[in-house]
């Protein structure tokens, strides 16, 4: 081989090595820092910059509903007063009724798609289990996302001009300007990002720190390569993500579907009156760490036989300390707030777990993790949206 050929081969080899080194940087996942906690805040939220010019808005993360909405500067009788100035829409933001995004949202919310009354806009109404509701129109605007190429996709979301409060609404909207609804659907933000090629897989996940905070990610690049327990997603549970029926080792057989959801008070709710319990010590308790040694881990078991999978729930994930120093079981009676036979795994149960919702393969996964740094990557820093 001539010296020129050898030199050219060496140059190509170096170029290939540089390309391989760059591959890990070409991620399609989007990571957001989570704020809030299970108690006493009662919600986890992300900050997103929306519009042109971009303005910050805090969005309460809800994996049980498919609608993302902001409180708009056109209220009728809204009771919500968020931390930032209300979003101000323009006529160019309005999504018409015959738009595919409107069709998807109406389908996700179980609404009739009828454009005869208001063909120029996409109206919606959505009610939550706790009595909260949002009435509004669908808009589209730019979202500034923390990606390598600084994507600013045009995404559809709700402009809520009439919000009615439920049991938790007053507390939640002190911290939030709206809701980031990423429940199962075809018009939710994660689905839109996949459709626009911003992420390659319709997968998202979250990790909730036991002392608050954590992270949320969209896309499959941040899924751990090993150590994840997977179960199939149950069907026919609406917009909830569910691993199906489960057994909780509190001598409670949860024969009805279990929904995995980050919403409401972030406490787990099951259909059993016996679970609302509190205890008092001689002196008021200040921290869960002071009493967790007196409790044993619980287990949630899904499936049967070879397909059986178990999630261990340490004491710090199912007990809470109240402001008055009582120790309470953080598992509430869901039938009292209209959940009927649906049991919800709340944010408290999922603390210090990375939870993965894989819509590509219709499965849910979890793994124990530190929620203050990404697995195998640099420590988590706040997202600059």
Q: Where would I find each of the regions flagged by the language model?
A:
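Aspartic protease catalytic domain
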Residues: 2-14, 18-19, 28, 35, ...
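Signature of the N-terminal lobe/flap region of pepsin-like aspartyl proteases
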Residues: 32, 39-155, 159-168, 266-277, ...
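Residues that flank catalytic or metal-binding motifs in active/ligand-binding sites
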Residues: 44, 66, 139, 153, ...
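Short coil/turn segments at secondary-structure boundaries
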Residues: 72-74, 170-171, 194-195, 219-220, ...
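Acidic glycine-/aspartate-rich tracts in secreted/extracellular proteins
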Residues: 74-76, 149-150, 186, 222-223, ...
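C-terminal reverse transcriptase regions that engage the nucleic-acid substrate
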Residues: 181
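Flexible, small-/acidic-enriched active-site or ligand-binding loops
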Residues: 217-263, 326-327
């Amino acid at each position: 081989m001539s010296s020129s050929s050898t030199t050219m081969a060496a140059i190509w080899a170096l170029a290939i090595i540089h390309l391989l080194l760059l591959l890990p940087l070409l991620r399609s996942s989007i990571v957001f820092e989570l704020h809030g906690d299970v108690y006493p805040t009662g919600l986890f939220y992300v900050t997103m910059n929306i519009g042109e010019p971009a303005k910050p808005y805090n969005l309460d993360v809800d994996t049980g509903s498919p609608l993302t909405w902001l409180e708009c500067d056109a209220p009728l009788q809204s009771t919500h007063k968020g931390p930032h100035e209300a979003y101000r829409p323009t006529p160019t933001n309005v999504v018409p009724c015959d738009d595919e995004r409107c069709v998807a949202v109406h389908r996700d919310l179980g609404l009739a798609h009828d454009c005869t009354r208001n063909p120029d806009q996409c109206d919606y109404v959505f009610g939550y289990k706790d009595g909260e509701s949002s009435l509004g129109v669908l808009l589209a605007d730019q979202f500034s996302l923390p990606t390598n190429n600084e994507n600013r996709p045009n995404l559809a979301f709700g402009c809520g001009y009439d919000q009615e409060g439920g049991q938790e609404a007053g507390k939640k909207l002190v911290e939030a300007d709206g809701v980031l609804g990423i429940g199962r659907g075809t018009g939710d933000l994660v689905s839109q990002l996949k459709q626009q090629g911003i992420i390659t897989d319709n997968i998202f996940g979250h990790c909730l720190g036991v002392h608050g905070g954590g992270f949320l990610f969209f896309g499959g690049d941040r899924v751990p390569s090993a150590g994840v327990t997977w179960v199939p997603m149950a069907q026919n549970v609406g917009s909830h993500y569910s691993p199906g029926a489960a057994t909780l080792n509190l001598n409670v057989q949860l024969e009805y579907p279990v929904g995995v959801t980050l919403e409401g008070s972030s406490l787990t709710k099951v259909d059993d009156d016996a679970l609302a319990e509190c205890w008092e010590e001689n002196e008021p308790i200040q921290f869960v760490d002071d009493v967790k040694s007196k409790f044993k881990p619980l287990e949630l078991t899904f499936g049967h036989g070879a397909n059986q999978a178990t999630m261990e729930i340490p004491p710090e994930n199912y007990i809470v300390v109240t402001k008055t120093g009582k120790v309470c079981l953080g598992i509430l009676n869901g039938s009292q707030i209209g959940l009927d036979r649906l049991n919800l795994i709340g944010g408290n149960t999922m603390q210090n777990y990375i939870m993965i919702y894989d819509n590509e393969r219709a499965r849910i996964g979890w793994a124990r993790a530190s929620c203050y740094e990404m697995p195998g990557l640099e420590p988590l820093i706040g997202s600059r949206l």
